[in-house]
A protein has these predicted regions:
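N-terminal Sec-pathway targeting helices
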Residues: 2-14
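Alpha-helix C-terminal capping segments
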Residues: 93-98, 283
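Short, well-structured active-site flanking segments
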Residues: 96-110, 224-231
Length: 349
């Protein structure tokens, strides 16, 4: 092993030792398990006791950092319903095709989706910027379909064809799955732009906590999406029957404005998915984290679960580092960095 690799392994060792040596005692042990993963190795493999893991009750979870490293996972790769977290991918794909000022028209099909709504009516029109707020703040299924149909129409036009609202939305969903492949999401399949998963909308869609974290990380790198995913409430203007109408939008989130550094949250719920949330925290300390919880025991609990993951990360991620250039470590593939980390941890435990 050359000197550079020895230094890199030492750096990885120091980082993980800093993470694991300082873990606080958990308040209760009922919501941790030996299959929970720290840097892709289970608590059992690391011989970690429950009091050295985050305590929360979601059935699936992922905690990812700005580099895409999965620091913690619980059933993070298991297929699950993600409900309205699907709208994160809708925003990502639409931003490839629509500008902030692009006008979005609400079709009869979009207005009639049902369930979670931004209060849009057939014939309403608004800018894509406002439509994103309706999508990400109010979690409007009407907004999701309207956006998908507008972007899908452009996709079909580029191919020299066209179609009705259903054809446009189908083209958009195809693009969602293409984007999933581009982002390396290996455990995701999208069937609609809003995430409904029952009755006519039960079309075999699925994702997983780790893939949703990757989606949110990608979304936060898009200026227009990032600017519209962090509102607790927002007002938008739609043109309705030839006159401007203001719609007040409310977010069901409980992290924004209350949890330190919370800068983005998307919530979701269906009976199949249970309460879920994807969120981002940035405290300006050089680290950004993305937490995803699926299948929490209640809607309020999904925010408690998210906070538990962030608390664990901020309490335990050490800044200790061997005297080696950051770019040397960053230049390694994620898997190679973790391989060094795991090897040193297992040797020294």
């Amino acid at each position: 092993m050359n000197a550079r690799r020895r230094h890199l392994r030492a750096a990885a060792c120091l980082t993980l030792v800093g993470l694991l040596a300082c873990l606080p005692l958990a308040a209760a042990f009922g919501s941790v398990n030996e299959d929970d993963m720290v840097l892709r190795l289970s608590a059992a493999e690391r011989a970690l006791p429950p009091d050295r893991l985050p305590d929360f009750d979601a059935s699936c979870a992922a905690l990812m950092d700005e580099d895409g490293t999965l620091w913690f996972g619980r059933n993070a790769d298991d297929a699950a319903q993600i409900a309205s977290l699907t709208k994160i991918m809708t925003a990502i794909v639409a931003a490839d095709w629509l500008d902030a000022s692009t006008m979005i028209e609400v079709t009869p099909e979009a207005a009639s989706v049902g369930e979670s709504s931004a209060g849009l009516a057939q014939g309403d029109s608004m800018t894509f910027d406002d439509a994103l707020k309706a999508l990400l703040t109010a979690s409007g299924n009407d907004a999701a379909s309207a956006i998908a149909q507008a972007a899908g129409a452009r996709m079909l036009a580029q191919e020299g064809s066209g179609g009705d609202a259903h054809a446009c939305e189908a083209a958009f969903v195809e693009a969602m799955n293409a984007k999933a492949a581009e982002l390396g999401l290996e455990n995701s399949f999208f069937a609609n732009p809003h995430g409904l998963d029952f009755d006519a909308f039960a079309q075999g869609q699925y994702s997983c906590a780790a893939d949703v974290a990757t989606m949110l990380r990608a979304a936060m790198q898009i200026d227009l999406v990032r600017a519209n995913i962090g509102f607790s409430q927002a007002d938008i203007t739609v043109q309705r029957d030839g006159a401007p109408v203001t719609l007040a939008l409310e977010n069901t989130d409980a992290l924004l404005g209350s949890y330190p550094g919370a800068c983005a949250t998307k919530t979701g719920y269906t009976l199949a998915a249970g309460p879920c949330a994807a969120s981002a925290v940035n405290r300006g300390d050089g680290h950004k984290y993305y937490a995803v919880v699926l299948g929490s025991s209640s809607k309020p609990q999904r925010f408690v679960d998210s906070a538990a993951l962030y608390d664990w990360a901020y309490a335990n991620r050490s800044s200790l580092r061997a005297p080696i250039a950051d770019e040397d470590i960053a230049g390694l593939a994620w898997g190679e960095r973790v391989a060094f980390t795991v090897a040193w941890f297992m040797e020294g435990w």
